[in-house]
Amino acid sequence: MQNKTAKFLLSLTFSISAFFPIEAAEIFNGRKVSAIHPAGANGSKILKMEETILSKSIKPETAYFYWQSENNLIMIKNGQSFSVDLASGKAVPTENNDKQNSIVPPEAENIKWSNNNSIAYTIGQNLYFSDSKNNRKLVAKGDSNISFGQSVSRNEFGISDGIFWSPDNSLIAFYRKDESLVTDFPLIDITTRTGSLKNLKYPMNGMDSEKTDLGIYTIADSSVIYIKVDDFEYDRYLTNISWSPDSRFILIQILDRSQKHLRLNMYRATDGSFVKTLLTEDNDKYVEPLDPVYFLKNSWQFIYRTANRDGYRNLYLCDTTGKVRRLTTTNADVRYIGNDGTNVYYTSAEISPVESHLFSISIKKAKGGKASFAEFSKIGTPVRHTFEPGWHNITFSPDYKYFIDSYSSFNLPFKAILKSCGNKFEKVITESYCPLSDYATGEVEIGTVPSADGKYSNWYRLLKPKDFDPAKKYPVILYVYGGPHSQLVKNTWLGNIRLWEMYMAQRGYIVYVQDNRGTENRGLEYEQAIHKQCGQVEMADQLVGIEMLKSLPYVDSTRIGVHGWSYGGFMTISLMTNFPEIFKVGVAGGPVIDWKWYEIMYGERYMETEATNADGFRRTSLMKKVNDLKGKLLICQGAVDNTVLWQHSLNFVQECIRQQVQLDYFPYPIAEHNVYGKDRVHLMNKVTLYFDDNL
C-alpha cells in the first residue's frame, strides 16, 4: 500500500539521528532508552511546515553507489558523479558521460540493459529491443487491454519488472498482461476544459483479474514463444522469474488465485515446454513469494527464500533435482544479498528486530571445492561482517572482493564504508553531518511494550517537546500505519522519525509511533496474525501502547489523537470508531473503508473474499461503524487515487450523510494515492491545524 547486474544500483537514504551516546545493548535487550539531540541544549531555530516538506537543507541527503566494473566504484551524491579509489577510499569528481543513454528513446519506460549494452524497453503498451548500434525492433505490440514488458500483479509478490534478459544476452523473457476482463474504474481529470475520463483497470476483490503469460523473444531470428503454464488453470500468478545459468531454462514461481499453493516450475526456453516442478509450498493462510531464485556462481545449485518452512524468511540451498536444504538457521527474517560461489551473503534481523546486519555462510568443503548436499549439513558457520549498531545496506563489487556498507543508527545520521569481504580493509567514503543541529528538537525515547496476546515485544518511539516539563500534561498524537511490509521503528537516525513528528512536538504534542503484529521482520506467525481480520489485532496491540501512555503522569488521557495514511487511514478510522472513548481527534488519509473495494492481489491475501470470509468482511468494514463515530474526524484523499479508490472515502461520507453523522472532508483534486510538492505543504498544514483546533 508496496537483481543483480554489474551495475547494481542502491539508493541510500540518510535518516535523522541524535548524538547522545547509547550502548548497543540498550537497543538490543528491549529496555526503554532515550536520547536528546545536541540541539536540545543549544538549538533555537523553529521548524516551519514548508521546510519539513520542501527544504533540502534539513532533509536527509541521498547517495547512489554502483560498480561499473570490479575495480571501478561510482558514487553519485547531490547530482555529482564521483569515482571512488579503492585503495584510499577517496572520492574524486568525474564527468558524467554515459553514452548508453543516447540510444534510449526519451519516451521509453521499463528500461532493462543487457550485459552487452543492448536494451529492451516499453513505449506505451509495446515492447522494443535495440542493440548497441541502435537498431530498433518491435518485439510485441499491445493495445488498450494488453501490454507487454510491464510489471504485473500490481507490483505484489516482489514483482517490480516485466523484462528479463537471459545470462548470455540472446533471449528476452517478458510479461504479457491481458486486462480485457478487468473492470474499468473511472477517474476524472479536471485539468482539461470540460474534464476528461481516464479509466483505470482495477481488479477488485472477488472479481475478474488480469491474465498473465510469459513470452520469450529470440534476438537472432526475432521469434516469440510463450511458456506453456498449465498449473491452477488460468486464474493464477506468474511470479519471480529466473533464468538458468546456461540460458536454456526459465524458472517461474506459480501461485494460485487463493495464494495458498505455490509451485516452482522449470520450463525450456526453446519451446516453452514444461520440464519439472522443483518444489512446492502450501499454507492454509497464504504463501507470499517475494524473491526469484539465485543460482550459485558456476553452479546449478540455487538459493531460495521463504518463510513457509520454518516460520521465518530464511534461505534454502536447492538444486534442479528437487533437493532442498536449509541454509540459514536463525529465528529471524533474512534477506539474500549475493554469492561468490563459495559464500552466501545475507542481511538478518537476528541481532535485534530493529537492526539489519550483514552475515555470510560458507558453502564449500573444508578442503576446498563445492560441497555436495550430503556434505552441506556439516559445514558453514555464519560469519558476521557488520558490528556497528544500526541498519546496514550492502552493495557488493562484481567479484565480491569489496562491499559498500552504508548505514545509520540512532546515534549516527549516515556513514558509508568501503570494506573487503575478509574484514581486512576498511575506508570511510562519506559521513553525513547533522542537518538539524541548529533546531530546537526534543527528547526521543525508543522502547517496547508487549503485544496484546503477550507473545511478543512491540517496538515504539516517543517524541517529546523541546521544553518538556514532566509536571505538565501533554496531548498525544498517535501516528499509525500498522499494515504488512512496514516497520516504522528501526535503529536508524532517531529511530526512523519523520520531520512532521518533530514539527508537532515543537508545537507541544507528544508523538507516539508503534509497530504491531502484522508488520514485517518478525516472522510468519507475527505477520499472519492479521489474516482474515485486518485491523483487529493491530488495534489491540496499539491499545497496549496507548494504555502505557495513559499511565504516564505527563500524558493528558482526555486529549489523544490519531493520524495515518492508506492502511494507516484505515487504522485511524477503525480506532476512532471502535474506541471513541479514547480517541478525541483523527485525521485519516486515503483510507481503506471496506476490503471488498480493494484490489485482488493484496486484499485476497490478507482478507480472502466475501465468499470465503463473510464474517471477516463484516467485522472490518468501516461502513458498519459510522454511527460509532463520536470524535472529530477529518478524511483527506486524492481524487485520482489509483491505489485506494476514491470510492472508499466517498461511500463513507455518504453513509455519514445518511445517518446524520458529522465529519470533515477534504479532497485533493489532482492527487493520486500520495500528495506531493506544495500540495503536500497544504495537506500537512491542514492536518496540523485540525489537531491544533480540536485536540
Q: Model segments located where?
A:
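Beta-strand C-termini and the immediately following turn/loop, strongest in propeller blades
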Residues: 37, 69, 74-79, 85, ...
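Surface-exposed loop and turn segments in beta-propeller and other repeat-based domains
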Residues: 44-54, 97-102, 136-155, 205, ...
